[in-house]
Amino acid sequence: MKKKSAPTPLPPETANTSPAPIGATAGIRVENCYVFKSRLQEYAQKAGLQTPEYHTSKEGPSHEPVFKSTVVINNTSYGSLPGFSNRKAAEQSAAEVALMEIVKSIPANANIPAVQETGLCKNLLQEYAQKMNYAIPSYICTKPASGLAPFLCTVEIGGIQYIGAAARTKKDAEIKAARTALLAIQGQSEGSANGATKYIVVPGKRVGKEVEKRPIETPKPLKAKKGGFKKKWNKRKFMKKDGQAVDVEKDEARVAGDAHDSDVLMQPTVITQEASCGTLFLQPCEEAKRVEDEPPRDIEMVQPDKENQHSDAALVQPDDEARVEQEPSRDISVVQPNEEAISAKQEPSIDAATLQPKEEAMKTGCVALVLCLNISVDPPDVIKISPCVRKECWIDPFSMAAPKALETIGKTLHSQYERWQPKARYKLQLDPTLEEV
């Protein structure tokens, strides 16, 4: 087997000296199309030879391998250039070397056409145009009036026109024009810079891996937490004082004296207590406010009676123009007299007192309690206080001391009954002493 490793250079007339088309980049060349294996296979078919066989070897370390390929055609081996980094490029280089050597070995009078004269030139030129995103090459053939070669063809690619040699047929003229364009493109400046090599497929320079530049991550500013809106709910607070449990419910109604609702009267809060010693029940009403109290037995019941009717209790009515005056040092209310005296009758047993507030007194936040007493005195000559005197006791119903005040009044009346005269009215205070109005 004959082996050729050092091919002879081409004649000077076949050197690549034509400039590359305008717009062609150095990174994309004709050899990137990899058509030399196809050319070699087409040549073998036309010559009646066997299909070319490629043998590729791998050398060097695993991270930087080096490939070298050998092609066998017509019992002749052709080796590729050394230093390729991939198998495909090494095989293309071996096919190119084989084609170059076959062209030189073919006699001039042979019937087999040269590889450059086949239709692969047009295919190669079209594939190159697609790689470069150019338009499809256009061929314009003209027929001169005189001459042995009647057809001349011009091909345009990348904005540059290339004129081929004259040919007897239109097809041959297009092939020659494509061949002229390929030779011009292959003679670009990059091929000249690599030592003006006659081969197209040459090993490229290895490009080191660029260090990955990670973008500097800027920390995102923390978002301020939004303040949560607290919902106001109606809460029940249980307060214990002196053994009394009071259930207070928050009222979201409009408050009296508000800037927008100045005409709205304040509705007093309903205070409900269990019936026990000294417990006071207060309930508001539009026409009259009724206060019910169920004290122990030692407290007398007083009910209002305008017509002086006989009953178990006496009627207590506050004055229309009464004013509430509360003493700062005590929870005791100041009693104001009424213009008209209300008669009271003696009753043998009085257990509790029923008190009624007045509307005008409610506006000020206090309740006027008028206490008319039916007292059984024995002996009557002991009393030195003038009879028929009205007694009024003003007590703040919102004060926790109101039940205690009534309890004290009842104890005072029960313990000092000898000082009271029948049908007499007196001013009552929490102090055990009694004062005349």
From Swiss-Prot:
Location of the DRBM domain: 35-104, 120-187
A GO term for molecular function: ribonuclease III activity
SMART domains in the record: DSRM, Raptor_N
InterPro entries documented for this protein: dsRBD_dom (IPR014720), Raptor_N (IPR029347)
Single GO cellular component term: nucleus
Function, as annotated: Binds double-stranded RNA.
Protein name: Double-stranded RNA-binding protein 3
Species of origin: Oryza sativa subsp. japonica (Rice)
